[in-house]
Amino acid sequence: MNRQNISGTSPYEAIIGFSRAVRIGNVVHVSGTGPVGADDLSASEQTRHVLTLIESALHQAGANLEHVVRTRMFIAKAEDWEEIGRAHGEVFGGIRPAATMVIAQMLNPKWRVEIEADAVLPDAG
């Protein structure tokens, strides 16, 4: 089975040794994606920025947001849950992937959210 590594623009990829996304067959795993370059934005704006980065990685892997079956949201502060959740819902409200929200410390203290996503493309046959 072919493996396709997708690189993004995060400076952390080379340091930590990871890909923005990896496609194996018809499955795409998008790494935890933080709001790189959007540090000073609100929680909802950071979430929208992160989802744009995820969408770009999916497109590079031949997928799109409609193929997402699971997201994991890591949030820095419990009080941001609704703002982040609503921004997530703006994108995924009609798709409704399985989702989890966890409170976690961020790599960058200005980040309020980091999101992972898994997508499954339809079988070719």
Name the predicted role of every residue range.
Residues 1-69, 75-125:
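N-terminal presequence-like segments and the immediate start of the first folded domain
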